Every structure is written in C-alpha cells, then in structure tokens.
Amino acid sequence: MTNEQKLLSYLYTIDSIQRRQLVIALSDMPYQSLTLAVRNAVKHGYVEVFRKDESNHIRISQDGVKYIRSVAKDSLDSEKRANMKRRFKGEQGRRLNRVETTSCMCRAAGIPLAKEVGISLSELLITDTQDYARFMNDYFYDKGLLFLSDELSATIKATHTVGEEYTTGRSRLVGIIINCKGIFFLYCTLDKLMRWIVSYEHRRADAITKILKDSDASKQNADFDYVCSLMYKSVIIGKTCAMIPKIITGNKYGKAVTNPGKNGIADNLLTLTNLEQVYARNYFVPTNTLGVELLSRTVTLTRDDLNQMIEMWLSEMTNTHTCVDAREYTETYIDDDNEKTLIFPIIELEELVYQKAGREKYHIVCERGTQDGISRTMGNKVIDFKDMNNEPMPAHKYDDAGIRRDGINPLTHSGYWEEEP
C-alpha cells in the first residue's frame, strides 16, 4: 500500500482532521512522505482541504472514497465502512473527537492502545494469563499502554468489584495509561473548558483504582502494587497552550476571576480547582508535535527524574549556578543573577500556581511554543523567556489578572500599554 493509499485509508475512518495534526495521526510515516502523499491526493482529487475554526482541515472526497474502496476493499469490510462513515454531531461527536485525538497523541508518543496490541485489561489483572506476561515484559517498564474508557467500563462490570452505577455516570475520562511510573488519567478538553462534574470523576477514578488494587496482579507483583498505591494523576490534553490559564482560572478567556461566588458555571467545568478535588497532580499537553514529546516526558519521568534533567541542563548551559529546593521543585540562580530562574521541562499546573504565589520575579526556561500560555498564567513576575537551547524567546506580557500589558489583544480587544518605569 502506497503512502497516498495509507493516507486515504485513515481519512476514510474519520469525518475530517486538522491538516497539521496528520503528522501525529500518521506518526509512522516520515514527514516528507506524508507531505508528498497529501500533495498527490489533492492533485488527484481524492481529498478536500477546507477552512474550519481558523485552521486548515482535510477530508476524503467522494472520488477518494471510490478509489480507496477499490484498492483496499479487503481491509475495509462492509461493517467497518458503515461504522466509520457514520457522521456524528453534538456531544457524541465531540466525545469521539476527544477519543481520536487522545489515541493519536498516545500512538505518536510511543504509547500503544491496549486493544490494538491485543491485551485485555480484565486478562491483564490475572497473573497466570498471557496478557499479564506480555504487559509486564513488553510495556509496564517502558511507556505503558492506553486503556480506553469503554474497556474500563467493561472490566468494572465483569469483575463485580463495584456496582454497575460506577460505569453509567457521565464521566469525561478518555482512558488511563498504566506503566511503572504510575496510573495517569487522561482527559481531552480540545479548545474550550468542557463540562466536568467532580462527583462523576471521583467515583470513576475510585472504581478504576479499586479494581486495580484488588486484582491478582496487585497482590502478587510488588511493582504493580506500588503503582496502584501512588497518588492519582491526570493529564489534560488541550488544543493549544492558551488553555493553560483557562483551566487554572476557570474563565473561558483565561482571566483571573475577581468574584468566584458569581462564577457558578465554573463549578461544573474542567478547572484546576475541580481537578484538585480528585487528582493530586495535574499536567497539561497541547495537541501538536511538541505535545507528543511533553506527553512522553510526563508519563515516564518522576519528579526526581525531572530535577535531574534540570540539573543536567544547568550543567550544559551555564557557567555557575546554585540550586534551591522549593517543596519538591527546583529553583536556581544562574551566574550570580539576583533573580531566580525556573525551568519547566513539562507543564505541571500545580507548579505554575505555586511559583506564581511567590514574591520574587523570575526568568523562565521552557519549550518553545509554551511560553505565551505560561506567561499569561504567571503574570507580572515574569522577566523573560528562554527555550531549552538557552535561546531568548518572544512572549506577550500579562498582568496578574491575565490582561495583556504590552498592547491590545486583537481577538478579545482587551489589554493596555504599560507605562515605562
């Protein structure tokens, strides 16, 4: 099958996709080959490119459907075609989009879906099964596996560990990643704060943790039992890093809420305040190639690993530095600078809030592409940004309320010019 046919086979299974997200969805195809495949498909009239939500999207055309059916009919059986060509709208469509986006991100990060490698969660929890042996030997000590929400529900029902009501709530959980570093609960909020009920999510997380803790695998394998005993952690997947201040403030514009008592809608949205009632640690990754790398780091590196990564960066990029422990985080003073430097190899929401609450100003080192979302979250105390190659990065300046202080935002028409000191 040619690269163009692989592209069409994938587009056949979905309604449409952002053009730039194809590199994530088809991560096994080299970038240049994918670009050429798209160009050829457009030339042949097999795909259509259109604008949606201010970005280019791509979908298969009727000619493309006819072509791929003729060349790949053995793999595109009639039942699969009927299911994949069905067009979903409303909340059901958004849920499917969240699952597809999360699945693509995990595949690109080297985290396979359990159902795609033929491992069942219910079988994995029994130590004398082949699925358990395969999981422990091939995946547990690596990046782990992604178990989607429908399989979690089926396992809860099959084990009878908790009541069936734990599977029928309107939880927004997409799935969980299990590896030797912990259990990560994945949510996909796309480009806006989605509805998120604390009681539903708490009940769901408790039910999943209970079936894992009470399993044969937990009782007979110390490493698996250790993972089950760790604190709950969530990974929030959003369209861009502009979602970071929105999640932290609970405001759809990312502005600080001045009167929380009148912000009742946020009580039922995916916000950090609500997340912290269920999860001890909450992380964010955007849906792009940078997000793939951040997702991989988030689920494979402990806080000690991250602090070692920071220490290694300092050794390579600075002449002299002094590290200070601040809770479990690392702060540093570089080359006798009076202002501290914060280094963010991943985006942990609690760390951003903790550092913003401090009194000192700071320089920030982070991945290129995350700086504007972090700048809006951190506010007045940010001095400047550098990327992980120690190169300066431009970023808008914001005050502590999340309002631009270096000009007017052309989209929201809010902001001001700060007077020079």
Where on the chain are the PLM-derived regions?
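Short helix-capping/hinge SLiMs at alpha-helix to coil transitions
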Residues: Y10-S16
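Long, compositionally biased intrinsically disordered regions
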Residues: L186, D191-M194, H202, D206-I208, ...
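Accessory beta->alpha helical hairpin/"wing" motif in late/C-terminal subdomains of nucleic-acid enzymes
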Residues: R39, V49-D74
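Short amphipathic alpha-helical interaction segments
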Residues: S27-H44
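Short acidic, hydrophobic short linear motifs in intrinsically disordered regions
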Residues: S16-L26
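Short alpha-helical "packing" element that flanks the helix-turn-helix/winged-helix DNA-binding module
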Residues: N3-L8
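Short, amphipathic alpha-helical interaction segments positioned at domain boundaries
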Residues: D63-G93
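Exposed, interaction-prone assembly regions rather than primary DNA-binding/catalytic cores
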Residues: M84-H202, D206-T209, K213
